[in-house]
């Protein structure tokens, strides 16, 4: 693990601090714990200069990542987020960013840690996570508190109960008590009123049931084969799971529309229909139903072959 000497020029960083002094030596991992557990702005600047060379270049890297993650209402100026009119984000963008960050095992490990001992110059320092919901509210496993005079009290929480995993973002609270209460109320409301639905499985089950109940559905004019072999384009299903309000689960609509009459030849990969999916309070999406085999058109060879089959069957009889 890289060890960094803490430089004197970083001492002027305002806001909450890890408490580093000039020429302190600390590992990158310990800086990350100091950043995420106790909002160490001095740790943020030290990491930014280590990674980006300077604060401006690191801010540029953050803004590039924001574009990749489609954080359309976010712009970074600094690694610590102290008040600046050009440094801003939204609750929605913070949720997207948190969802991405939680996929990183190191990040996840740190933000779910209630207390941790770091070493500065080989001297131990105890850190206690400032996230008041960690270890207090059932299912909470992170992620970060925040405060500036401009933003007031903020908290991003991650919480999982059963198969429902949510991110809750509360911004602009006047007090820590308000931040805690609002977060708890929002989280409990979601788990009391929403369920996770595997929409991909629902679509597949509906489609397989349709095939089972409509084995002789297709009428293929001038066809040498009797039936199609159809499948759905699973790549068009935009997500596997969706959180749905409990009272609206039965309002999920999956409608299969397939043309019953076709004329040969029907090529493989030919679209024969669509599935319309309508979710509660969201826009619908469609999935193509595709034929997987080529259906040949009857021709002279087909009729000759059928004649010979019938002829020799009569001779055998």
Predicted regions located by residue number:
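Domain-terminus/edge residues, biased toward the C-terminal soluble/receptor-binding domains
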Residues: 72, 86-88, 92-93, 98-317
């Amino acid at each position: 693990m890289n060890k960094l000497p803490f430089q004197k020029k970083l001492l002027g960083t305002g806001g909450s601090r890890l408490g580093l002094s000039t020429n302190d030596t600390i590992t990158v991992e310990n800086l990350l714990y100091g950043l995420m557990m106790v909002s160490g702005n001095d740790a943020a600047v030290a990491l930014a200069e280590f990674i980006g060379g300077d604060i401006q270049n690191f801010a540029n890297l953050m803004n590039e990542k924001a574009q990749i993650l489609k954080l359309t209402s976010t712009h970074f100026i600094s690694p610590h987020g102290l008040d600046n009119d050009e440094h801003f984000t939204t609750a929605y963008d913070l949720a997207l960013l948190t969802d991405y960050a939680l996929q990183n095992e190191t990040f996840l490990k740190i933000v779910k840690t209630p207390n941790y001992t770091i070493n500065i110059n080989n001297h131990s320092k105890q850190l206690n996570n400032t996230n008041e919901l960690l270890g207090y509210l059932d299912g909470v496993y992170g992620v970060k508190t925040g405060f500036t005079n401009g933003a007031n009290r903020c908290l991003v929480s991650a919480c999982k109960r059963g198969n429902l995993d949510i991110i809750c973002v509360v911004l602009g609270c006047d007090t820590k008590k308000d931040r805690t209460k609002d977060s708890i109320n929002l989280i409990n409301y979601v788990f009391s009123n929403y369920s996770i639905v595997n929409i991909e499985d629902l679509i597949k089950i509906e489609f397989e049931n349709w095939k089972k109940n409509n084995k002789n559905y297709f009428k293929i004019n001038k066809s040498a084969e009797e039936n199609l072999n159809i499948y759905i384009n699973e790549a068009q299903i935009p997500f596997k799971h969706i959180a749905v309000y409990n009272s609206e689960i039965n309002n999920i609509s999956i409608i299969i529309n397939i043309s019953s009459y076709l004329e040969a030849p029907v090529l493989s990969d030919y679209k024969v229909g669509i599935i319309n999916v309508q979710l509660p309070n969201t826009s619908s999406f469609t999935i193509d139903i595709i034929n997987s085999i080529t259906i040949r058109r009857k021709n002279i060879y087909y009729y000759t072959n059928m004649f010979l089959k019938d002829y020799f069957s009569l001779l055998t009889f």
